[in-house]
Amino acid sequence: MLTARLSRPLSQLPRKTLNFSDRENGTRGSLLLYSAPFVPVGRRTYAASVDPVGSKAVLITGCDSGFGFSLAKHLHSEGFLVFAGCLMKDKGSDGVKELDSMKSDRLRTVQLNVCKSEEVDKAAEVIRSSLEDPEKGLWGLVNNAGISTFGDVEFTSMETYKEVAEVNLWGTVRVTKAFLPLIRRAKGRVVNISSMMGRMANVARSPYCITKFGVEAFSDCLRYEMHPLGVKVSVVEPGNFIAATSLYGGTERIQAIANKMWEELPEVVRQDYGRKYFDEKVARMESYCTSGSTDTSPVIKAVTHALTATTPYTRYHPMDYYWWLRMQIMTHFPGAISDRIYIH
């Protein structure tokens, strides 16, 4: 059931009636929606009760750019000892150079490819030996590293499905398993960056959705197991922040992905769908990538709260009103209704 912060009685609110059909039962009906003012989700005020940061240490994956890069700098400013896991540390990416240029003993970049067990194990040993008291453990782990792609199911190769899963899902599992002994000793926090696409599917995003649904399930299982051990597990589900994170690297990168995808399609798929349909899907993706929020602060605030609050939330939803409402409808309403609104 949707909940709203109402400024006047429900009966006085503007109403919108949406007709829908139930294909299985052959019935027709209507859904009465009330439009009500909500507190913008991206500006949510979190509970103020927090644990003192002190000398607590955290590891963040995927710090070369995007959320991870911004989060590393923010948590450092909050007083944390930050280990910034970077895919391109060995190659000196711009993000690594900027973080290293801060020349702080409390901000250390670490080479970390979440797909390689040897790098994950090496990072765990480096971080353990860098802690003031390894027996007290590591306070926080933020699994942020991730990649994405787009394309209908018939446009997406099995190699692409595996590549996205290796980073987003198995990378999260791999890093978590490597650092859980340290997290358990500290009775600390695990914060997994999922997505609104981990709660609701969308067209042309199946590789990404599959992995983020998996992160959600993994996080729930881990939360149940860690509860009696004093470790708290939270999931952050950002909305559309592609414009802020440059996840696709701009329209040129999208076109490059699209051209490669088209060239590798089986001839029967190209003939059945046609280039016009394919190009329309690419254009929609370009529009989506340039229409999102350019401000990462809602996500940064959510992760910070999950790491510092005495009682962190199970899930955080830093997203604008449109995506928040859509997620509620797609996860709480019968499929016949949500399909009628967003598909038919």
Swiss-Prot record:
UniProt binding sites for substrate: 195
Q: Which GO terms describe its molecular function?
A: 3-hydroxybutyrate dehydrogenase activity
Q: Which residues carry this modification: N6-acetyllysine?
A: 73, 97, 103, 177, 212, 260, 281
Glycosylated residues in this chain? 219
Annotated compartments:
Mitochondrion inner membrane; Mitochondrion matrix
Sequence positions bearing N6-succinyllysine: 103, 260
Q: How is its activity regulated?
A: Requires phosphatidylcholine as an allosteric activator for enzymatic activity.
Where, by residue number, does NAD(+) bind? 59-83
Q: Does the keyword Isomerase apply?
A: no
Report the EC number(s), separated by commas if there are several: 1.1.1.30
Catalytic reaction(s) noted: (R)-3-hydroxybutanoate + NAD(+) = acetoacetate + NADH + H(+)
Keywords, in A-Z order: Acetylation, Allosteric enzyme, Glycoprotein, Lipid metabolism, Membrane, Mitochondrion, Mitochondrion inner membrane, NAD, Oxidoreductase, Phosphoprotein, Transit peptide
The record's comment on protein family reads: Belongs to the short-chain dehydrogenases/reductases (SDR) family.
What this protein is called in its record is D-beta-hydroxybutyrate dehydrogenase, mitochondrial
| Taxonomic source organism | Bos taurus
